[in-house]
Design a protein with these regions (language model features):
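An amphipathic, hydrophobic-aromatic interaction surface with interspersed Lys/Arg
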Residues: 1-273, 298-299
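Long, low-complexity, intrinsically disordered segments
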Residues: 284-299
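Intrinsically disordered, low-complexity basic tails/linkers immediately adjacent to helix-turn-helix/homeobox/MYB/SANT
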Residues: 271-285
Length: 299
């Protein structure tokens, strides 16, 4: 094993799988998908999870909660455990810092269950969807039994699923809707206040996918500024920058800032010293162009 890897607990499998790190290249791709509102973001994330897992894993068998746990762990290890939320409503600003490590523990502890609806000669088993984006009640169905015919809905194409569910009478579908809300216990991430709306993670809604977008979104302009500084000022190869993690990138940037601050203080100190010989003293406040450092950037 050449690269650093780490274990991630997957609730539905009740086991841990080993993953490699998220690099800048992948993170930028995620951010672009998010900001372009691209419908293929969910597909990209699932494919990325499969690529990053060293152990054998069938991502098609993972629930939305499993995928959230994996992505939260990746985010915590490779980007950081803190997420700062800010809003500005009616000129009233609010900010809140979330501990994603704590949220991962709470999500891991969410209890899920399956239930079977039995009406006449029809048995329908519903479970937490194995997808990030929930399109309809069909995503909750894992198995349908009509008389002696049994259909494994997880193995069917979307069109075949619709053909089977079209056979279900209205009273079965109505019963399913009433049972779906009982499959999971939602957790509150943010309690609603005047300028920050309530945020809840519920495995029976699309809140999981929306939360994933929130924790991975970032400022693309900052990324390119970081790339410029690391390549032009610290002389790092672009392929190397592509393949380090966002948190490693921030360490490099902070180190560069520290060096420039030391250089700036040295220049200011020299500017206050008396001139020696024929060497003119720098004018007060003089600084090199390299001492001007973009600040305030955060992932």
């Amino acid at each position: 094993m050449d690269n650093f890897s780490y274990l991630v607990y997957i609730p539905s499998l009740n086991t841990k799988k080993r993953f490699i790190q998220l690099n800048n290249n992948k993170h930028i791709s995620i951010v672009k998908f998010i900001q372009n509102k691209d419908v293929y973001l969910a597909e990209y994330l699932v494919s990325m999870i499969e690529d990053m897992c060293i152990d054998n894993i069938n991502v098609k068998n993972l629930t939305g909660l499993d995928l959230l746990c994996i992505l939260l762990a990746i985010r915590n290890i490779c980007i950081g455990t803190r997420l700062e939320l800010t809003t500005d409503v009616n000129n009233e600003k609010s900010s809140l810092t979330l501990d994603l490590g704590d949220i991962l523990k709470r999500v891991t502890d969410i209890k899920t269950k399956s239930t079977t609806i039995k009406i006449d000669n029809i048995h329908v088993t519903i479970e937490i969807p194995r997808t990030l984006v929930i399109e309809s009640y069909i995503d909750f169905i894992s198995k349908i039994k009509i008389n002696k015919s049994v259909y494994d809905m997880r193995s069917l194409s979307k069109s075949d699923k619709h053909k089977i569910t079209d056979l279900l009478p209205g009273k079965v579908v109505t019963s399913m809707y009433s049972k779906i809300g009982d499959l999971s216990s939602p957790i509150t991430i943010v309690k609603g206040i005047s300028t920050l709306p309530e945020m809840v993670i519920d495995a029976t809604t699309s809140s999981i996918f929306e939360f994933i977008k929130l924790i991975f979104d970032s400022n693309l302009s900052n990324f390119y500024t970081y790339y410029y500084l690391l390549a032009s000022k610290m002389h790092l190869d672009l392929s190397y920058i592509d393949n380090i993690t966002p948190i490693e990138t921030e360490i490099y940037i902070n180190k560069y800032k520290e060096e420039m601050e030391i250089a700036q203080k040295s220049i200011e100190s020299e500017s206050k010293s008396p001139a020696v010989g024929n060497i003119p003293a720098p004018s007060p406040g003089a600084q090199s162009s390299e001492s001007i450092i973009p600040g305030g950037f955060k992932f």
